[in-house]
């Protein structure tokens, strides 16, 4: 279970530390992907494999939408390992997607992490603060 908010600086080689309390959950690997909200999603490899296996087992008709969904899921996925210092290298394409230049925020979101640029996270936090009650009132149980 991932929770909390952690601010880090990206180094000159594009590396960032994963919060120490989460590193053991990424012992088998970490998969980074473009998040739909302009962030980077980070999944433990076993969780990613489970989700993609479920996706691939669906009776999907090979139509335009299903091909696009496959592209979204797989074309921007990067399978990485933490180095000895608990860091990962953020691929340039994902840094660009998330507009990450120097300071970033790693947030825990239940079963995965999100990696945001500091600026984008501040904007997201402002929206969350403004819409908190509407979000809770319209929330459906999480499966």
Language model feature labels by segment:
Residues 1-8, 12, 22-80, 84-85, ...:
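Flexible "stalk/tail and boundary" regions
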């Amino acid at each position: 279970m991932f929770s909390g908010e952690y601010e880090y600086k990206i180094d000159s080689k594009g590396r960032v530390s994963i919060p120490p309390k989460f590193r053991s959950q990424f012992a088998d690997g970490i998969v980074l992907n473009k998040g739909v909200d302009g962030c980077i999603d980070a999944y433990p490899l076993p969780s990613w494999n489970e989700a993609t296996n479920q996706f691939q087992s669906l009776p999907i008709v090979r139509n335009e939408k299903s091909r696009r969904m496959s592209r979204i899921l797989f074309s921007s996925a990067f399978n990485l390992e933490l180095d000895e210092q608990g860091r990962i290298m953020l691929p340039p394409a994902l840094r660009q997607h998330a507009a990450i230049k120097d300071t970033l925020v790693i947030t825990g979101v239940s079963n995965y992490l999100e990696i945001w640029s500091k600026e984008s996270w501040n904007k997201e936090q402002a929206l969350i603060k403004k819409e908190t009650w509407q979000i809770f009132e319209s929330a459906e149980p999480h499966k």
